[in-house]
């Protein structure tokens, strides 16, 4: 069997990650991913809850007063079937921020109640020369039939569609998959939860795989409003500056393999950022910094405003080729994020007083 992580990640956890990556979780259709989380986390958590909107929350210490919420979004970008033409081709709209030019000629998976139906997005030599650029409305999905009647027996309008690209290893400890944004984040918060539990974390921990981040960010708002945490740790991916088309001047120099990324944004708590850096220094994890002039465009933006306001910190995983058929990440960054967040969790006392949280920041 393939071995992904060469050092501290156990084989059972690698299987967990691969099953997460294999699940289809187009925004609004996250059930496959929820089932994977429940399978692996129910034996380890005090409680596992799935709310009406679909957020799946693993709880450690539900009766403890001081609560830390960790979130990462389970949903992914994709397409939705709208109608079928007379030739049996599926017409679609986007669900989330897809890159249209990456779809033509690719194999896709259409999810139905009877199981997946496979097809290909029609393409031809001059398709990419279309005036004004490609749009989702230009897509026609060929599922191998030649009439509307045949297609409608297999697929109904509203069916979610994803690119049929899976996990594989690259060189140098890197790996590729569809939907590392943000299935990697989900994996990280669950692994940090397990490490913190083993180390005797004294506060209440709520590790939430949220829904809808790619479309509405409603899942994060629901979870934050229900848990009412004292603070929140959001884990998502971020662009690296070390690949084509990216510029370090836009938000900072971020490299694959360079370690977890902390965000300097108006919605991120300065104090929590500093605490994260102190934790990183204690355990020898190198961190990187990115800057945002306003919002972070992650679940942190919704959580920050929930209730009476929730102090929030954003920890990001460097990622190349975000929202493309094959996104690339580095195992060292994943391990660094897990270690950093676990250290952060166990550094808090049961009441939050260990670090003096809640006192005015003197800086």
Give the label of every model feature segment.
Residues 1-3:
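Extracellular interaction modules
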Residues 5-363:
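N-terminal hydrophobic/helix-forming segments and targeting peptides
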């Amino acid at each position: 069997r393939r071995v992904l992580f060469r050092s501290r990640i156990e084989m059972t956890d690698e299987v967990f990650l691969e099953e997460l990556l294999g699940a289809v979780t187009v925004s609004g259709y996250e059930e496959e991913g929820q089932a994977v989380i429940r399978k692996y986390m129910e034996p380890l958590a005090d409680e596992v809850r799935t709310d009406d909107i679909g957020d799946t929350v693993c709880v450690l210490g539900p009766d403890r007063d001081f609560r830390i919420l960790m979130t990462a979004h389970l949903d992914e970008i994709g397409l939705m079937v709208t109608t079928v033409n007379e030739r049996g081709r599926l017409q679609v709209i986007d669900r989330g921020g897809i890159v249209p030019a990456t779809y033509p000629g690719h194999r896709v998976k259409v999810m139905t109640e009877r199981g997946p139906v496979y097809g290909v997005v029609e393409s031809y030599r001059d398709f990419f020369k279309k005036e004004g650029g490609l749009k989702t409305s230009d897509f026609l999905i060929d599922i191998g039939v030649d009439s509307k009647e045949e297609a409608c027996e297999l697929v109904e309008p509203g069916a979610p569609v994803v690119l049929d690209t899976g996990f594989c290893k690259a060189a140098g400890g890197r790996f590729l998959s569809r939907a590392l944004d943000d299935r990697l984040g989900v994996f990280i918060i669950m692994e940090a939860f397990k490490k913190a539990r083993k180390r005797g974390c004294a506060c209440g921990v709520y590790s939430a795989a949220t829904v809808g981040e790619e479309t509405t960010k409603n899942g994060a708002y629901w979870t934050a409003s229900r848990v009412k945490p004292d603070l929140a740790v959001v884990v998502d991916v971020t662009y690296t500056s070390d690949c084509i088309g990216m510029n370090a001047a836009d938000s900072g120099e971020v490299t694959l393999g360079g370690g977890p990324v902390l965000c300097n944004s108006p919605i991120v708590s300065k104090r929590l950022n500093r605490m994260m850096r102190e934790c990183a220094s204690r355990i020898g994890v190198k961190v990187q910094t990115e800057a945002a002039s306003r919002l972070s465009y992650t679940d942190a933006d919704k959580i920050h405003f929930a209730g009476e306001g929730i102090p929030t910190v954003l920890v990001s995983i460097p990622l190349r080729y975000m929202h493309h058929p094959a996104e690339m990440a580095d195992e060292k960054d994943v391990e660094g994020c897990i270690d950093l967040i676990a250290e952060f969790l166990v550094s808090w006392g049961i009441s939050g007083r260990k670090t003096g949280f809640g006192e005015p920041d003197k800086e």
